[in-house]
UniProtKB/Swiss-Prot annotation:
Protein's UniProt name: Phosphatidylserine decarboxylase proenzyme
Cofactor(s) for this UniProt protein: pyruvate
Quaternary structure and partners: Heterodimer of a large membrane-associated beta subunit and a small pyruvoyl-containing alpha subunit.
Membrane topology: Peripheral membrane protein
Site description Cleavage (non-hydrolytic), residues in chain: 253-254
Biological source species: Pseudomonas aeruginosa (strain UCBPP-PA14)
Gene Ontology BP term (one): phosphatidylethanolamine biosynthetic process
Role noted for this protein: Catalyzes the formation of phosphatidylethanolamine (PtdEtn) from phosphatidylserine (PtdSer).
Length: 289
């Protein structure tokens, strides 16, 4: 590891993650025209954001930076894979890793893995259906479309907010911060689907001001403590989302991890670490019995 990378990793442990994220979140919600227009224009240039596919192409039309960052796309900008039974990629970005969940652990990077149960908030019961299953980790870069969509149609069963740190998420931290995704703040969404249980985990990172879902809005428990929200109780109307429907969004980006049970899916042979992906592309197909 280079000296520059060592310095970067050391800074990750020393910086006040949540304070920085709150300050950046405040700036991202600022509506002052002189500020938000300059910030959005700089960001679009810096990261070469393609606004031709956005519903609103005019950078100055966004009320604040977060509205720009979570911008909607034009109809048809992300066609859904048509293969029978296709499991869709949940987001734009790049595959960080994908493969089997072995011995209750998920591969992070060379020399590093993390606990499936810890990713899901330390709940062995929640983790049990995914033991021996498969995972895919999608990293969303700053220039990407930052809404997350359903890989399969499903009925929401449970949502778990898991407090944690906010380490930056990139190749350097993945290779050098142990248990990165099981340490960062995250929201776990559990669904019942035609392929059995499916989890979509929205992982925060440094400067990720908030995580939002379409059914709960901003997921911000008053105290930073683990909190479970159940949606399969008789008193609640079922929440069902169709394949390709928006699930949630990052107000400043990070990572989405999708989990499946054993013998349910076979990943697209053309995908591997660092493969670029777009929401709606074929991530996997049903595994043949």
């Amino acid at each position: 590891m280079s000296f520059k990378d060592r310095l970067f990793i050391c800074s990750q442990y020393l910086l006040p993650h949540h304070l920085l994220s709150r300050l950046i979140g405040f700036a991202a919600d600022c509506r002052a025209t002189w500020f938000k227009d300059r910030l959005i224009a700089w960001f679009a240039r810096r990261y070469q954001v393609d606004m031709r596919e956005a519903q609103v192409e005019d950078l100055q039309a966004y009320e604040h930076f977060n509205a720009f960052f979570t911008r909607a796309l034009k109809d048809g900008a992300r066609p859904l894979a048509q293969e029978p039974g296709a499991v869709l990629c949940p987001a734009d970005g790049a595959i960080s890793q994908l493969g089997p969940i072995e011995h209750g652990r998920i591969f992070q990077a060379k020399g590093h893995s993390y606990s499936l149960a810890e990713l899901l908030g330390g709940d062995a019961e929640l983790a049990a259906p995914f033991m021996g299953g498969d995972f895919a980790t999608v990293y969303l870069s700053p220039r990407d479309y930052h809404r997350v969509h359903m890989p399969l149609a499903g009925t929401l069963r449970e949502m778990v907010y898991v407090p944690g740190r906010l380490f930056s998420v990139n190749q350097t931290t993945a290779e050098n911060v142990p248990e990165l995704f099981a340490r960062n703040e995250r929201v776990v969404c559990l669904f019942d689907t035609e392929r059995g249980p499916m989890a979509v985990v929205l992982v925060g990172a440094m400067i990720v001001a908030s995580i939002e879902t379409v059914w709960a809005g901003l997921v911000t428990p008053p105290k930073r403590e683990l909190k479970t929200f159940r949606y399969d109780e008789a008193a609640r109307a079922p929440i069902r989302l169709e394949k390709g429907a928006e699930l949630g969004r990052f107000k400043l980006g990070s990572t989405a991890i999708v989990l499946f049970g054993p013998q349910q899916v076979a990943f697209n042979d053309g995908l591997g670490a660092a493969s670029p992906v777009r929401m709606g592309e074929c991530l996997a197909l049903p595994k043949q019995a």
